Amino acid sequence: MEIKDIIVKSDFINLTNQEIDKIIKILDIELNDKEDPRQRLFDNIDLIFKDNKAKDVLLSKIFAGRKSVKWFKIIYVGNDNIENYKDLLIKKIESDEYCFDKIKSINNKSLESPSLYTCIKLDDNKYIMRFMIPCGTKTYNDGQDYSKFKNINNVVVIVDLNCEYLEIRTNSKDATRIANQLMDTFKAMYVSIRDLDVLKNYNGSLEKFKSSLYNGNFAQSLSIPDKNLKLTEENNELLVNMLIVIDDYFGDKDIKKFNDKVQALNIDTDGTPFTELLLAGMASIGLKIRKDCEEDLSKQTLYNVLKKYITNYSGLIKFSDSPVGEIYTISVGLKTLSIFFKSSVSEKTIKYIRQKVL
């Protein structure tokens, strides 16, 4: 089997309209007015693979696009006999149990857990697996009646035994379900799978990660306060009055009046920094850069004042995969240890980010 044998019609959703049009133009295909171009290309997939230009466009996006990606580290339990463990794992993967070079029929209606249905070899000790996984139900309303149906995701999993990682292209929750299922069989070969921290090379810092990327720009953050502080109504009012006093000073520059007002407030902070008190009662803090702002979030005053007292939960980073390339946006999940490509990206872009996080 080859890669074209495991492509399904829904994969064509990953291609943008421009990419669909490009393939149609390369192959000189004429469409009827009401014809679905993605259906037409799927029906002519053999024709696409006979044309190198069309095939390159297809393969750059067919499993990419707008995707959540989560990586896992493949760990051999003992440092001795690693090659033997790897050989055992290869034999396991290249077996009927892993649907190697075959496609297993899946009954979607009865599907309750991730189900591996095909696996092929991409390169030396590198494989691509596909899983069907149920992800809730959807309701269809036709204006008079409604019906519910099970929603199924078709997930791509890359297994690279040389670089020792799993790359699962779906949300963190489903990726973990798939990884756990693989772990159940991998552990028999003295192999374990662990979450890979996408910021491990950057000491957990979104700012350092951003700086490692071409044209990196820290555009947005969602954070949580480090301490769960509570204020009385009286102390809350005193804090508000303190801010008013500071504002007044910037207006009249009267330092004596400023000192008198501060002493009159007599706020008892019990050693807690003023900025940290301002975060009392907050569950999360979201900061976002204006579109016309040239400098990113890490250069903004408010972020730099707060960052000592908050922990980033997630962040948006804009970047390029080359010095003068197109700008893409990713959402980095520090709790989920995953990356969501908010822009429609190619395999080249996913590879660029992969090399940064492994």
Which role fits each region the language model picked out?
Residues M1-L358:
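Intrinsically disordered, low-complexity, charge-rich terminal extensions
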